[in-house]
Amino acid sequence: MSRRNAAEKRPVLPDPQFNSRLATMMVSRLMQHGKKSTAQRILSDAFGLINERTGGDPLELFETAVKNATPLVEVRARRVGGATYQVPMEVRQERGTAMALRWLVSFSRARNGRSMAQKLAGELMDAANEAGSAVRKREETHKMAEANKAFAHYRY
């Protein structure tokens, strides 16, 4: 265990283009090799595509997609007397949102499509409609927690 103090949590500033903290978090997760402007352009293009296809507010759809992909419970490994149990635990709001964004980005990257913006737009629209890989991952996580409910008393 480290002897240093825990790193101070930095506040997430709203995105200058969309005035949304969630958009800033998404840009951070989209970014590769420190190329923030590229990540911002991908998100902006994805929102443009969503606006074209649905005609609605892309930011609202994005927030709905993140909400639909956010897990409420997860399983964590806990060793008790030589055996490892999958213990279901509640997920804090902050961690749940971070997991949802991570899943949305990773499943967007795994999709086959032309540009990253198109893949991201597709995944966000699917997630907003309670479909897509990110929502399936959340359901899987919830099923795992439900299946291991018997070990809930091992919570720490």
UniProtKB/Swiss-Prot annotation:
GO terms for biological process: translation. It comes from the Bacteria. GO terms for cellular component: small ribosomal subunit. PROSITE patterns: RIBOSOMAL_S7. This is Small ribosomal subunit protein uS7. Part of the 30S ribosomal subunit. Contacts proteins S9 and S11. One of its GO terms (molecular function) is structural constituent of ribosome. Pfam families: Ribosomal_S7. InterPro entries: Ribosomal_uS7 (IPR000235), Ribosomal_uS7_bac/org-type (IPR005717), Ribosomal_uS7_CS (IPR020606), Ribosomal_uS7_dom (IPR023798), Ribosomal_uS7_dom_sf (IPR036823).
